[in-house]
Design a protein with these regions (language model features):
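Buried hydrophobic positions in well-ordered alpha/beta secondary-structure cores of metabolic enzymes
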Residues: 1, 23-25, 110, 160
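Structural signal for hydrophobic packing residues in well-ordered secondary-structure cores
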Residues: 1-2, 6, 10, 40, ...
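Mobile "lid/hinge" segments at catalytic clefts and subdomain interfaces of large enzymes
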Residues: 5-76
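Catalytic core of soluble alpha/beta enzymes
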Residues: 73, 77-78, 84-204
Length: 204
């Protein structure tokens, strides 16, 4: 079991929780990434992590309502359009709740790139961003790598899941090189939902 693999009662330190903050399939979120999660790994107790997540989530929901309620502000809508706009709202909610981004609270991003990828044309389409911008937004592999690299430089992202089409091993390697050049060696990149290095029965 996972509990046994992590050391059971003898574990020195348990992993931080990953707490869902934004679901890309929810209408109110209006983002293209599959999921954004809070990683409160700078808070020592599980109770403290859960409390922080609740406080942040409440402020984040209010910020989303305000963003989605804006009408007749095309420039502002473009500014808020990308998934980076949702990350900015989440970062602001963390700070307003009294926590420190990059010290107490980090983010995990499940880009879910496979659902954005159009195999025939070889580009990634961003429908939510396109709607908010009023024009089609699509990115090549190189453009998506640059986009993800920029986001990890601007926000305290500690995990990137499915950042590119899963069969694009060359692209994953290029992304890893980009992050290494930024000294972002603390970021874990998962090209699938379960790392292959873990024992097969870990998640049973």
């Amino acid at each position: 079991s996972l509990y046994r693999y992590l050391g059971g009662t003898h574990a020195l330190k348990l992993p931080a929780l990953l707490i869902l903050a934004a679901d890309g399939t929810a209408e109110e979120t209006e983002m293209d990434f599959r999921e954004l999660m809070l990683v409160p790994k700078g808070i020592s107790s599980v109770q403290g992590q859960i409390r922080a997540a609740g406080e942040i989530d409440s402020l984040f929901r209010e910020a989303l309502k305000k963003r989605n309620g804006r009408e007749g502000e095309p420039d502002r809508k473009k500014q808020d359009a990308a998934d980076g706009g949702v990350l900015k709202l989440l970062e602001k909610a963390v700070e307003e709740a009294g926590y420190q981004c990059g010290k107490e609270i980090f983010f995990a991003v499940n880009a879910g790139a496979g659902r954005l990828y159009e195999k025939q044309s070889g580009v990634y389409r961003f429908p939510a961003e396109s709607r908010r911008c009023g024009q089609r937004v699509e990115r090549s592999r190189e453009e998506l790598i640059e986009y993800l690299t920029r986001l990890t430089g601007e926000y305290p992202i500690s995990l990137l899941e499915d950042p590119l089409y899963r069969e694009d091993r060359e692209g994953i390697q290029e992304l890893e090189k980009k992050l290494d050049s930024l000294n972002e060696d603390d970021i874990l990149i998962l090209a699938g939902s379960i790392p292959k290095s873990l024992p097969q029965d870990t998640y049973e």
